[in-house]
Amino acid sequence: MRGAGRQMGRDSRSRSRSVGRRGRKQRSRSRGRSRSRSRSRSRSRSRSRSRSRSHGRSSRRRREHERRRERKRRSRGRRSDSEGEQRQKSRRRSQSLRPPRWHSQNQSSCSDSGEERAQGSWARKGHRRSWSPGSSASSLDSPRRSRSPGTATLALSQQQSLQERLRLREERKQQEELLKAFETPEEKRARRLAKKEAKERKKREKMGWGEEYMGYTNTDNPFGDNNLLGTFIWNKALEKKGISHLEEKELKERNKRIQEDNRLELQKVKQLRLEREREKAMREQELELLQREKEAEHFKTWEEQEDSFHLRQAKLRSKIRIRDGRAKPIDLLAKYISAEDDDLAVEMHEPYTFLNGLTVADMEDLLEDIQVYMELEQGKNVDFWRDMTTITEDEIAKLRKLEASGKGPGERREGVNASVSSDVQSVFKGKTYNQLQVIFQGIEGKIRAGGPNLDMGYWESLLQQLRAHMARARLRERHQDVLRQKLFKLKQEQGVESEPLFPILKSEPSAAHSPEPEERPPSPGTSVDPVEPVEPEEATAPGEAEGEAEGEAVLMEEDLIQQSLADYDAGRYSPRLLTAHELPLDAHVLEPHEDLQRLQLSRQQLQATGDASESAEDIFFRRAREGMGQDEAQFSVEMPLGGRAYLWADKYRPRKPRFFNRVHTGFEWNKYNQTHYDFDNPPPKIVQGYKFNIFYPDLIRKRATPEYFLEACADNRDFAILRFHAGPPYEDIAFKIVSREWEYSHRHGFRCQFANGIFQLWFHFKRYRYRR
């Protein structure tokens, strides 16, 4: 029983415990539910509160917006009132210029009160004045107080501009307030952050930070400083200086003063540095100017030396061409002008005789060469070259006129008819330079005077011919003076008494004292008058004749030719006509037609046999010249070999072979020349090959082929010596050539052969092509 009771008690206790546990669980659940309900209630309350707050904010914003609108309306009304008031004031000021009317104080007050009632509050504030007798009297007494219209207009414009600025400021402020009222929290946060950053930037600029440090913050900087934006205070240094007791504000002021002093000191240092740099730049500029002047002087001497060098080279080329028998007209003229400076060289012919037989192309080349010599000589012998230019141009005009004479009657008339030209030449011929100059001045005066019947073409053509005759006369007189000087020097050196070089023409006194009137150039027709300026010639002719009679009258070249022709006619050099009885018995008489037939037969026989005047050497040179292009020139500079002994010298007389060599020159268009030159300004020509033609017609051993040997040049590695050896009876001959590698391919023009007594060695140099 006891066990059963115990068991029942245990069961009841376990039941009570489980019931208690269930109750506790239910109570905890109810408590959680109540808590969640309270939380939801609090959330709903907070939501309602936030809604009410947002509703209050929106209502507040609406009220503020309505207030701003009301303020705008009021400001517009005030602005309109002020504008009306200003109009009234301007009217009153314009009326104030008139004399004021006297009225009583009551009337003025009444009018003032009426105007105040009409103008509203702005008038009630006392911003307008009323006229009174006293005020008008005072204005009459002191006219300086009355404002002028210009001053009133200026004051009005200033007031309007001030009001406009105030209005703009007010509108800007209202817009900012409106934006602030309607901005979101994010925009507000961004605005405040931007304002803070601008403030920080201004602070950093004031602290002297550069642009590269502007983006640093306490959390983002390469120095790892969490207090970067704060002011660093060095307490130890302050204690050492004894200023640790100062407050932060005083320390900031002290640091600011120190920074200002440092800034001023830096400015001074920077100013001094800039001044030093400026002085240094000025010194460098002065030194550069001095250096330029020195270089200009140095280069000036170089230019002079270069011109003299080119002149020497041109004269040397002329000498070489004269020596080789291929002289150009400019070479002969250069030799003539250089012979004047030489003490012993004598040139018997006038320089313009070198133009005989030249074509138009040759004369044009001569003009270009004359210009080159004039530039190189720099003013020396300028009169000689100018006269030669005039004569050459006249000869070119004559040749072109002859070439154009067969083109028909459509040609333009050249001013002087062919029938009159011979008479003009006879008038100008034989006269001195002074006489021709007088005629030239007379023709110029006639052209300047003009006239209705003056043939300008005739007189201008005559003037052109006269210039050429004057140039010839001047060169002829210069030639005679040079001959006299050379003869005098030769006689002084040889100790011979002075005698005239040519026969003296003794002028008759009758001719000297009774001068005939000078011949006038024939006029082109009845419409043109003869030359008038003959009287000055007649006046000066006696004096000139006397001067010529006193000195030596030298025969000209034309006079010598005329004298020889006269001697020929007087001496009867032609066969004398014989009669039939004067002929010998065995004489065979031929009729003229028989003689002509025999002559023609002889000519035909001679033509069938070939050219009788062409020798073996001429044939050789003709063959050697075949295929000679524009890029090739004759090369005849021989290299002396010194005294060489030959074993066959006692049997055969050694002799040098004849040769005709050519050098091939051209432009090398490498990368450098392509960069710095073009076809208008080409680079200097270089030697690209040689063609040697050695003539061995009389070799003893016909089967022995001539040989060539290439030897190094001892004095210059850039050149080599090419020696030719053939055997008796010819000596070895050598030439100095450029030392470069040869092209031995026949496709590049290489030839080495001996045929018909001519040894030919043709070769070109290799072209180096540089590739990366």
From Swiss-Prot:
One of its GO terms (biological process) is negative regulation of lipopolysaccharide-mediated signaling pathway. GO terms for cellular component: catalytic step 2 spliceosome; cytosol; nuclear speck; nucleus. Residues 157-207, 247-299 form a coiled coil. The modification Phosphoserine is found at residues 148, 498. It comes from the Eukaryota. Residues 131-141 have a biased composition (Low complexity). Residues 78-88, 177-200 have a biased composition (Basic and acidic residues). The modification Phosphotyrosine is found at residue 573. Expressed in cortex, hippocampus, cerebellum, heart, lung, kidney, liver, spleen and thymus. The keyword Transport does not apply. Residues 103-112 have a biased composition (Polar residues). It is found in: Nucleus; Cytoplasm, Cytosol. Residues 15-77 have a biased composition (Basic residues). InterPro entries: Cactin_C (IPR019134), Cactin_central (IPR018816). Interacts (via N-terminal domain) with NFKBIL1; the interaction occurs in a pro-inflammatory-independent manner. Does not interact with RELA NF-kappa-B subunit. Identified in the spliceosome C complex. Interacts with SF3B1. Interacts with SDE2. Interacts with SRRM2. Interacts with DHX8. PANTHER family: POLYGLUTAMINE BINDING PROTEIN 1/MARVEL MEMBRANE-ASSOCIATING DOMAIN CONTAINING 3, SPLICING FACTOR CACTIN. Belongs to the CACTIN family. Plays a role in pre-mRNA splicing by facilitating excision of a subset of introns. Required for the splicing of CDCA5/Sororin, a regulator of sister chromatid cohesion. Involved in the regulation of innate immune response. Acts as a negative regulator of Toll-like receptor, interferon-regulatory factor (IRF) and canonical NF-kappa-B signaling pathways. Contributes to the regulation of transcriptional activation of NF-kappa-B target genes in response to endogenous pro-inflammatory stimuli. This is Splicing factor Cactin. It comes from Mus musculus (Mouse).
